[in-house]
A protein has these predicted regions:
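Hydrophobic "anchor" residues
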Residues: 96-97
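RNase H-like polynucleotidyl transferase catalytic core
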Residues: 130-135, 149-168, 182-189
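Acidic/histidine-rich, metal-coordinating catalytic segments
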Residues: 125-141, 159-163, 213-218
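Generic alpha-helical secondary structure signal
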Residues: 143, 150, 167-171, 175
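Mobile-element integrase/transposase regions
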Residues: 4, 25, 37-90, 109-117, ...
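Basic, flexible linker segments flanking DNA-binding modules
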Residues: 1-67, 162, 220-232
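C-terminal domain-tail junction helix/linker
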Residues: 149-153, 175-273
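A short acidic/small-residue loop/turn micro-motif
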Residues: 91-92, 102-107
């Protein structure tokens, strides 16, 4: 009786009361629980819905403008409860911030305009770019989805509650907020915008990024890093020729990136093993 399929949706007390209403008494409620406990059936007795696991995003870039990552973070305003929303889109191969904007609130329309502007300025052609984001309201909004569909941009989203599915954007925001000049609060949205202008200009054109061979994101994004690396190699060769005893081996400048990914695909792991 306790295991009858027709009773699977009923709590024990409900079943006991219904049977009693039908003139049938088998045992007390506590005895019913004891019987079920003995066979490990005290927990949920109903058939449970099964949800397929969300597919892990796997994106690979071997040059600039193949995969972009974007996200939104909040910057504190002058007063408690006042925040400004910072939208940032970056290229995962070069780490170059292709676009950003700051607004008093989050908006799918604003996100759409920013993405469209970046696609135009970077001259991205149809079916060549994947755009990765988490599952925030703006990221999954109808205006953004429709724009990407119309322009032939592949949409990619992080799995729910998996923060490391968007590592490049997370790292960029951490770098921003751990910058020594980053204030606890901004006096106004104009102050916040000025700070971001200076920060992203520095990040793109001056900061030598360890993940891209100590080159600036702009030099990797726009293809001047190869020439810069050759110049570095010539300088190191000259130093070696002048005094080779200073070195245990011939010095080489750091290598340029050849590939970047979000969740390294299995075939890439196998090839690099």
């Amino acid at each position: 009786m306790l295991r009858a399929p027709a009773h699977g949706d009923l709590a024990v007390a409900q079943l006991w009361a219904r049977e009693l209403d039908e003139g049938r008494y088998y045992c007390s409620i506590s005895t019913m629980y004891r019987i079920l406990r003995a066979t490990g059936e005290v927990n949920e007795r109903r058939s449970q819905a099964t949800h397929p696991a969300k597919v892990k995003p796997e994106l690979v870039a071997t040059k600039a403008n193949m995969v972009w990552s974007w996200d939104i973070t909040k910057l504190r305003g002058p007063d408690r409860g006042v925040y400004y929303d910072l939208y940032v889109i970056l290229d995962i191969y070069s780490r170059y911030v292709v676009g950003w904007t700051l607004a008093p609130s989050e908006s799918g329309e604003l996100a759409k305009d920013l993405i469209g502007d970046c696609l135009t300025r970077q001259q991205v052609t149809r079916d060549t770019l994947s755009l990765h984001a988490d599952r925030g309201t703006s990221m999954t909004s109808k205006p953004v989805s429709q724009l990407l569909t119309d322009l032939g941009v592949v949409r990619s989203h992080s799995r729910p509650h998996i923060s490391n599915d968007n590592p490049y954007s997370e790292a960029a925001f951490k770098t921003l907020k751990y910058c020594p000049a980053f204030p606890d609060r901004f006096g106004s949205i104009a102050d916040a915008r000025l700070f971001c202008e200076q920060f992203f200009a520095y990040n793109n054109h001056e900061h030598r990024h360890s993940g891209i061979g100590l080159h600036t994101p702009a030099s990797v994004h726009y293809g001047t890093a190869l020439e810069i690396r050759a110049q570095r190699a010539a300088t190191l060769d000259a130093a070696y020729a002048t005094n080779p005893t200073r070195f245990t081996q011939r010095p080489q400048p750091p290598m340029l990136p050849t590939i970047a990914w979000i969740n390294q695909p299995i075939e890439e792991v196998a090839q690099s093993a």
